Amino acid sequence: MDSAPQQQPPVEFETDPSRYRHWQVSFDGPIARLKMAVDPAGGLRPGYELKLNSYDLGVDIELADVVRRLRFEHPEVRVVVLSSGTDNVFCAGANIHMLGMSTHAWKVNFCKFTNETRCEMEDATAFSDQIYIAAANGTCAGGGYELALACKEIYLQDDGNSAVSLPEVPLLGVLPGTGGLTRLVDKRKVRRDRADVFSTTAEGMRGKRAKDWNLVDGVFARSKFEQEVMKRAQAIAAAPIKLLPGERRGVTLGPITPELAAHARLYRHVELSWDREARTAQILVRGPSAADVAVVTAGDEAIHAAGDQLWALRAFRELDDALLQLRTNHLDIGLVLLRTEGDPAQVLAHDAALAASREHWFVNEVLRHMARVLRRLDLTSRSFFALGDVVGNGMPAFAGCLLELALAADRFYLLDEPAVQVGLSALNEGALPMSHGLSRLAARLYGEPDKFEALVGQRGLMDAEAADDAGLVTVRLDGIDWADDTRMAIEERSSLSPDALTGMEANLRFVGHENETSKIFARLTAWQNWIFIRPNATGPEGALSLYGKPQRPHFDWNRV
Amino acid sequence: MVSTTVDLNSKIPNNVGLSDDVKLKRALESWLPSYLEWWNDMGPSDFADKPVFLRTAVSVDSDGWAHYEHVKMPDYRWGIFLNPREGESTIRCGDEVGKPAWHEVPGEHRNALRRIIVTQADTEPASVEQQRLLGHTAPSLYDMRNLFQVNVEEGRHLWAMVYLLHKYFGRDGRDEAEELLQRRSGDPDKPRILGAFNQPCDHWLSFFAFTMFTDRDGKYQLAALSHSGFDPLSRTTEFMLTEEAHHLFVGETGMDRIIKRSAELEKLDPDGDIRRAGGIDFDLIQRTINYWFTYSLDLFGGEISSNAADFFATGLKGRYREDRYEEHKAMGATYRLPVVENGHLGERDVPLRNAMNEVLRDSYVTDCERALRKWNRTLEESGSPTRLTLPSRRFHRHQGIYADHCFDPQGNLLDRSRFEANQRNWLLTPADNEYLLSIMKPVYEPGKFANWIAPPNKGIEGRPVEFEYVRLND
């Protein structure tokens, strides 16, 4: 049972509305209704039923797709009302039986993905003027309340019974791991002593007290609930704001269907390949062609018209899919080599044109999407080495938005050869921030502010030596040393403890201050992942293992 | 809000030392006006000033728990009683069986106990609300009195549960006690917690079916809780059971008297047309049984339940007559349950602890089958060829593993369209209710009974059937 998820067919992350099993989306002008109606028989894996609107990875893959499509395909939407299609239950959170029977890795990947989805909802609220409001027309427990917490406003039905709750600690011996604890005190500013009471009170809170403690923004009687929530939605939709310009015509996200080979997934701009024996994989991203650059330099309308075929959108959707594939379906791959191919000058030209159009709503969406994909990379628990060497006939193209791959990587090896060049664009200077808000350039040069200052505003290409001097390169190697040195580095890295590396990389990548999002992925997730392997949660007598079973849990009372 | 200061101890008969318990006294003092306000708003409509021949529990002694006199309902003395105990109570089931029972709420089990008590408590005022208009269509003074007896005792059962909330659950308990008076049966905004307690019960056939089937769920819940390791809950529910027996008597004999009368009318009418003779035909009675029995089955909770397993494992709730079982841990054993898998009915073994709701439901179904046999004996003795049946426990369910599937009353799987096509033959319809309301005219003359129901075999507490059980002319 323990390894069941891995023996199953690989998980695919691409979906579209025609395939949804768990969500209903409808539109009325600027208001979208998003109803969670989880099909109990629609679990991604056998062995559990998704009762009471509880969710698994499959449910969340659809939600992530909904959130993304709302931004690209429905730019007219200003408010997204999230409610339940099941009477009296908003959402019961992650399916406990699914968690109980999952491997550690599955749990961790599941939590990470759901966290990213909730951050996407907040990102849409902050940067796409799509405000999520949770209409909790029933009990809102655990991950269900955490889903509501990801919305800007939360309304709860006041029927003497419906409550919001975080019962994970008292009932399951784990944490509300989808940002619940963090959003409670950091986002909603619930007093921390009250948050302590709330998070240990299994039955949660309802009605007036939920409102008084700021656990929700309002409570409405059952018979008026729908009406009051919609009134609020209409008020938000009608509030005057300065929308980004550009015709609000949606861009359909077509499938990116990769070609599947024995040890590779081949996309149009991206190739993911893996070597199980060596426990390494490679992601190769090809830079924009001259034709791709011509599209962006033609201006807003041409970019909008290119739609989902725009290089910057297509390539990063492909990269996103490749990362998710690695995370979920290739657990034994420890080291990922990031390579780029193309003309770095074209990348810079591309970036300059895209940055010039960034006020257009669609370009804004493209840039926000690129940023999210890069954050997914930052948060992927694999070692990343960026390798700037010659690929086949092509030159590496670590410039602008593709230089972000090198800056996200744990190390950047660059071949010292005259034809190999790197360069910065406007996109390296804050347009694609990490989850804690810093640009990757600022994070890379956190301890060398002078070098950082010197690079800001610098455009054009530099050779390997200049890049090394500027602090962009970890190891610069000439053609004689390259093969041996990189081979040894790769083999050495692959021999180290994967757990220690995961922890080390997560610490080193995020220099500087924390924010709410980074706390969710660092503090909350790290503690949760520790608790997940502790006997008190997942041992034979642990609370999570025994949930729903006839035995009662027994704890080891020693504090660690 | 009415403001009252009363000498609680003389007003509230009790054996819980109320006069010496300042904290409890204070809590009840502030709750009492809200309770009376609720009773006036939601209790029996219009008969507040009529003396009713009521049984009042004034003590737990054998001569004190059933004290009869004519009382106006608002003056009824709602008391608080715990069954006395000899010796030390112990935990009766689960992992801790045999250890001393709890006399305070253990923090570890606070949430579970609160949930158990609030859910039980919520049903008590709910049934009063559901039945509040029935006095206006009572088929006799005898029946009217029984209705009011049931109502005041359901009120007392609310007191019994509120006592536990006030005494043992601190501020949260007081809040919950207040909420119990805020929820209303069938209210779209603040419904009662459980489904059957939000169904309308607007004529006497439903009243009798309700007291027969739904109150019988109450009996089994109380019986299971009377084996709780939380001693005050165990002792409270034990005492409630003595009163509950009367409610079941009202339901079971009420149905029996209707069946008896229908059999008589069947013979009286030349074509055997009971309706033409102003009675209630057997198909309609069968539909009523199907309706209320199945709604009541839902009250036992899911067939496979982690809560049920927890409640048993922790010793908070036992089985029916737990003391008659030899083994009280129920670990390792399984229960074979019919389940729907891939569109077919099969069987599955589930851990016994997780099946405790179903185990309790088994005891309940056996009891209902006994009553059905009794009614069928009445039919047999009356010479009627009709026999009534209990539907399958899979039929017409809204909770549990059968809720998402359709079954016929025999328990065979059906597709939804066939279920819907037959629904009016199986379950109460609006036309049924219209007909029943049309024949339910009040009969207020002592000793007289409505045409659709037979008189009882005997009166109450040695009084004749003609006794003026409710003094409407006072």
What are these regions (language model features)?
Chain A
Residues 141-196, 393, 399-454:
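CoA-thioester-processing core
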Residues 80-81, 133:
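Conserved hydrophobic packing residues within short motifs/helices of P-loop NTPase cores
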